[in-house]
């Protein structure tokens, strides 16, 4: 469903002022490291944003029916049988900039305990009219405030690149992401995602998505310690209202065995 974010309709490419805004956010997200823990958002970004002056709500929910039985760090959340998610509140500021707020990030543990996990701010910069272009691109920045059971670092961030092509009914999208906890450039965590989708008309899309965690850029983890999860995904809906559902299978010992994801999207 290539229009789930709502494409802006203003021709342009990213100009120097826009790149300056993106560079400012990048400066906030450099000089860091990350210990990968849980995630509230399992999604490949496609450079499409909410139209200027409009709001959009995306409700993320992820459930792990079979996964790791130990937390990623002492005091963390056990992934198996945990449900985590977040409402993502987005506002289209310009044809090339969307601001977002994730609040509240939450988890229902396998023991039935409901936890508040985090809050996040997001700044997404894209080439306008991504849906109408053969080649599209963008970059997203996130800053997070975390509780101790969600992440061992109080403040973390993400830089998410967006590069993709529309080839007829097919989409190929790469998100080369890095996660951070502001502790050194060499320790940036490389966590890319990729999506290959086939679009059947304007409302239905079938896709394969792969999410990975290779470890710090300065020294990747051994292959058996890396996380790799392959999702079969279906999208249905329009630019103003849609749903995405996926079933993920872990491919390595460090991955959760099965993960389900559900996203509900609605313009406000």
Each predicted region: which residue ranges?
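Transmembrane beta-barrel domains of Gram-negative outer membranes and organellar outer membranes
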Residues: 36-267
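Glycine-centered signal
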Residues: 14, 34-37
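Bacterial N-terminal signal peptides
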Residues: 21-31
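N-terminal secretory signal peptides that target proteins for export/translocation
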Residues: 1-16
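Hydrophobic alpha-helical segments, especially transmembrane helices
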Residues: 16-19, 123
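Intrinsic structural disorder/low-complexity segments
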Residues: 12-13, 21, 41
């Amino acid at each position: 469903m290539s229009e789930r974010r709502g494409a802006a309709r203003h021709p342009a490419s990213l100009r120097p002022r826009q790149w300056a805004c993106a560079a400012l956010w990048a400066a906030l997200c450099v000089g860091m490291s990350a210990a990968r823990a849980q995630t509230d958002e399992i999604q490949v970004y496609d450079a499409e944003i909410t139209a200027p002056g409009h709001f959009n709500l995306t409700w993320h929910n992820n459930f792990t029916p079979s996964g790791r039985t130990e937390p990623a760090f002492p005091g963390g959340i056990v992934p198996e049988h945990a449900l985590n998610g977040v409402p993502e509140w987005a506002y289209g500021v310009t044809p090339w900039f969307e601001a977002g707020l994730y609040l509240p990030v939450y988890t229902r543990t396998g023991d039935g305990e409901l936890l508040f996990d985090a809050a996040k701010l997001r700044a997404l910069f894209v080439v306008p009219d991504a849906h109408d272009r053969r080649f599209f691109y963008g970059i997203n920045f996130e800053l997070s405030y975390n509780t101790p059971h969600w992440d061992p670092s109080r403040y973390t961030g993400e830089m998410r690149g967006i590069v993709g092509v529309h080839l007829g009914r097919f989409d190929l999208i790469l998100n080369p992401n890095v996660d951070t906890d502001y502790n050194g450039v060499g320790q940036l965590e490389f966590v890319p995602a990729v999506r290959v989708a086939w679009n059947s008309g304007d409302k239905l899309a079938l896709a394969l998505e792969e999410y990975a965690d290779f470890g710090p850029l300065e020294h990747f983890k051994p292959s058996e310690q890396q996380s790799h999860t392959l999702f079969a995904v279906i999208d249905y809906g329009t630019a103003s209202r849609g749903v995405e559902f996926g079933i993920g299978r872990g491919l390595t010992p460090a991955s959760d065995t099965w993960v389900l994801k559900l996203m509900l999207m609605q313009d406000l």
